[in-house]
Amino acid sequence: MSAEAEEDCHSDADRVGDEGNESPAERDLQAQLQMFRAQWMFELTPGVGSSHGETRPCRAGRSSMLKAAADTKGRQELAKEEKARELFLQAVEEEQNGALYEAIKFYRRAMQLVPDIEFKITYTRSPDGDGVGSGYIEENEDASKMADLLSYFQQQLTLQESVLKLCQPELETSQTHISVLPMEVLMYIFRWVVSSDLDLRSLEQLSLVCRGFYICARDPEIWRLACLKVWGRSCMKLVPYASWREMFLERPRVRFDGVYISKTTYIRQGEQSLDGFYRAWHQVEYYRYMRFFPDGHVMMLTTPEEPPSIVPRLRTRNTRTDAILLGHYRLSQDADNQTKVFAVITKKKEEKPLDHKYRYFRRVPVQEADHSFHVGLQLCSSGHQRFNKLIWIHHSCHITYKATGETAVSAFEIDKMYTPLLFARVRSYTAFSERPL
């Protein structure tokens, strides 16, 4: 087959030489036909054509086509890389100016064009055109700045304004804007936001408004007062925490913006029936509620009523629920690095009015006694929430007789009836503030 192809190519060449008086269009057509035949024969027998039967015009046409395709692909790759380089350097400049969201957009577009564009850039020159990215420093100064967002925002406010303003009005208004207030007044407002209930969650949400509010919300004095209110004298030293805010967030503590709830269910046998084939069984359910306050007070209630009807009554200590137990608690951290909560609670005392008018009765001595309950709980975390679980470790009843001063202690066995208490946040508990921090 290769011999036939060579004979066809020679015959075509002789025919072109004999017919020298043909028009240029016909000569181009014959040349294209000759190239097509040679390429077709080369595709049918690639091994033979590459070694013996491939003619010089066939090799020249194929090499020119491959070279043109390679040049086109190379130009496209260079253009794509140059565009990615410009986008990346523009993102660097936006990041230096503080426009982080715009920088992220340019970074994303550059990475979509060339994934490893970061390693192909030389930072000694700026791209051709508008000169974006000039003055870029390869050191990690900007990275360290962004790691400490507080100092970064403080520096930005100092560079932008000759007179320090924490915020600026977004729209023009005839009313007085909050940016006019001095720093001392703003900090006092922030202390009202935290309030005596230690609503640090609202403070964190307030810090998202602007850079100035972020700086105010990170004020060390606010977080120091919050730590002192929770742990008292036991938190005088900041070590091993880096800041008061880190201590408040990381150190184990009970939560105040909700209530700890547990549900206990068991089945007991009912009364005997006259019918021997029927036995009554009852499913009993009851709840335990524990509410902690920052000033050291605690409330505990055991009732069969469900949370929707009980939780609103536990907002303050001045509740009218008769079965409520009131007391104080303290936090204790053992050598095994486990935090425990110990509380002493008593039933709310009720003064009964005595009516002695027109009554005569014999005085009978009644032995008065005070009842108190001692509770021990282990504080731990579960799931994605922190410090949201209390596990029973101790429960006892102490009866003190006033006449003799003796105290009788009855300890309860901690079994499966003492289910762990899980925390549930209640928004109404921090809906308004009564006193500042």
Swiss-Prot record:
Keyword set includes Phosphoprotein: yes
Locations listed in the record: Cytoplasm
Region Disordered: start-end pairs: 1-26
Biological process (GO), any one: protein K48-linked ubiquitination
Tree of life domain: Eukaryota
A GO cellular-component term linked to this record: SCF ubiquitin ligase complex
Pathway: Protein modification; protein ubiquitination
Compositional bias of kind Basic and acidic residues: 8-26
UniProt keyword terms in alphabetical order: Acetylation, Cytoplasm, Phosphoprotein, TPR repeat, Ubl conjugation pathway
Annotated ranges, domain F-box: 175-226
Molecular function terms, GO-annotated: ubiquitin-like ligase-substrate adaptor activity
TPR repeats: 84-117
Residue positions where Phosphoserine is found in the record: S126
Subunit organization: Part of the SCF (SKP1-CUL1-F-box) E3 ubiquitin-protein ligase complex SCF(FBXO9) composed of CUL1, SKP1, RBX1 and FBXO9. Interacts with TTI1 and TELO2; when TTI1 and TELO2 are phosphorylated by CK2.
Name by which UniProt lists this protein: F-box only protein 9
Organism from which the protein derives: Mus musculus (Mouse)
Primary gene name: Fbxo9
